[in-house]
Amino acid sequence: MSMSDDTHNSLSTGKCPFHQGSHDRSAGAGTSSHDWWPNQLRVDLLNQHSNRSNPLGEDFDYRKEFSKLDYSALKGDLKALLSDSQPWWPADWGSYAGLFIRMAWHGAGTYRSVDGRGGAGRGQQRFAPLNSWPDNVSLDKARRLLWPIKQKYGQKISWADLFILAGNVALENSGFRTFGFGAGREDVWEPDLDVNWGDEKAWLTHRHPEALAKAPLGATEMGLIYVNPEGPDHSGEPLSAAAAIRATFGNMGMNDEETVALIGGGHTLGKTHGAAAASHVGVDPEAAPIELQGLGWSSDYGSGAGGDAITSGLEVVWSQTPTQWSNYFFENLFKYEWVQTRSPAGAIQFEAVDAPEIIPDPFDPSKKRKPTMLVTDLTLRFDPEFEKISRRFLNDPQAFNEAFARAWFKLTHRDMGPKARYIGPEVPKEDLIWQDPLPQPVFNPSQEDIVNLKAAIAASGLSVSELVSVAWASASTFRGGDKRGGANGARLALAPQRDWDVNAAAARVLPVLEEIQKSSGKASLADIIVLAGVVGVEQAASAAGVSISVPFAPGRVDARQDQTDIEMFELLEPIADGFRNYRARLDVSTTESLLIDKAQQLTLTAPEMTALVGGMRVLGANFDGSQNGVFTDRPGVLSNDFFVNLLDMRNEWKAADESKELFEGRDRLSGEVKFTATRADLVFGSNSVLRALAEVYASSDAREKFVKDFVAAWVKVMNLDRFDLL
């Protein structure tokens, strides 16, 4: 054994050698497991936003706290703030309206209808990466301007709600009549780690619009909300931007009319900022030195603010009245001829060559400039379909106002889920199709009704597997990101869900349950489907020797087909559902990663996911009735056999084919095939974190615990969309 000179010297002087040197000894430093194994399964995604990160505690009730809010006073304070220009960040034309509208838009605009993630619902603009995206330059200033108001009202208003309300008030104070406002967005206290923002390693890396259809990405460049305002990959070509605009707005569920209305309305107030080259701008908030206290993008050009501000690098003002609502965007768009030019920062934009200088300077009343437009603004004139809509808005300002009001409301509320989640005095009465509306309940079963329904289900001849499968098929469409899907509404019986391959088994069970509904007279099919799962789980638990009553909350209703947007519900069809051993495509991630994705959408913890998969397997709930993962000789019994046999070292697993999606478990001594499994099964033995959980449930003293944990997780999934119980 050798000893370095430094170590020898330390010992000779009586100093501990391990307390010397400059290595980073802070928690989390050093080479991580993810560094060694970058493809490691992200089980940690299931541990996000726990009570350990929440300073308000698990008993905090935001809806109750919001009810104490003086809503009128809050809006009054926001209105006053709009014109309270601060010397450290002066307001353009004495108004922060454009800044706050952009803040609200960029908070909501990250939403993607493909997977329901992103959006304004949790105030994520406060955290990385969004707080430091290139498209969000200067929004750190907007949030700091709001801080005195947030400080004043405390927990009665969340940051997430305040961001959107500030945008609404900015529009209203500028003379626009909004469609309404629904509060109810609850803050979280750490970044969302589950959102896939893309694989690019450099900001503003270009993506072709066609690529957006292959992934749940909402922008054509890394770090942008939608599209590059200079055209695809800085092309400067308005017409070529049309496909990108349609792709990105379409990924939010917006049609052409909504897209034109949002662009025109969003560019009616305020301006862009490009006083000088981007080389003057410092690092983003996450990279900023500690003394800047979370503010980024410091500029050494002039004062760095006001007329010297650099944000996007574009220097565009669309309207003659940039602090008052008007139809000038469309009037100027069609009235003038536009020539390509560059901003002082060198960004490509357009100027109205034949226009007089009619645009006011934001800080010097004696100065005027010509109207300017973004490359993507001119797309609304030169793309044939966008042009038709734009001309209609030009000639009918009231139609534009109505379209923008509705599109803005949709933009800012799209990720909130059903209207039952909305709170506050300005919630619109009208039901909108994108809210997945439900009829009002007309019947709530009594305990006697429930007992009778359970008896009818038990006598129906349906197996435990069928009862459990139909309930899971109904409830498991829920997405925690945008709160869509779930069992309420019984949309499992409607198009498109009734025709999904994954629901083939459920489609055979539904007619039996529909007959029970007809016999009952008043109970909803939605309640009966969930109650079928209750009956199945209770029977399976009893067969395992555990007597347990599965909690059931009645009151679900049945949606109509005309309340169901088929195109939007198609997006809820799973690519994979590891709980049912279903996978439709092999070209998207790994099976085990898709299981984590599904569990995260269902807001499950890792232990909850583990208990549910183990239970679903022994209950025979595979979508196709296969024996994959059914590690038991007593299917239909809610036993811990899945875990016991998975961890049994007498079994040896080998891939059954080159795809390594199907595996055979053989007896090590005889070579006999005892079980078959998928990757969604074997991951509970191969992944070290999941194996640790599986070992708990495989233990000899875990029989009753497993049943209780399965039931708790099951009930959670069945009630994920019961916002009427809040």
UniProtKB/Swiss-Prot annotation:
Bifunctional enzyme with both catalase and broad-spectrum peroxidase activity. Its EC number is 1.11.1.21. There is a cross-link at residues 105-226 (Tryptophyl-tyrosyl-methioninium (Trp-Tyr) (with M-252)). One of its GO terms (cellular component) is cytosol. NCBIfam families: cat_per_HPI (TIGR00198), PRK15061.1 (NF011635). This is Catalase-peroxidase. Formation of the three residue Trp-Tyr-Met cross-link is important for the catalase, but not the peroxidase activity of the enzyme. The record marks 102 as: Transition state stabilizer. There is a cross-link at residues 226-252 (Tryptophyl-tyrosyl-methioninium (Tyr-Met) (with W-105)). Residues 1-34 are annotated as: Disordered. GO terms for biological process: cellular response to hydrogen peroxide; hydrogen peroxide catabolic process. InterPro entries: Catalase_peroxidase (IPR000763), Haem_peroxidase (IPR002016), Haem_peroxidase_sf (IPR010255), Peroxidases_AS (IPR019794), Peroxidases_heam-ligand_BS (IPR019793). Homodimer or homotetramer. The active site is at residue 106. The keyword Iron applies. Disulfide bonds: none annotated.
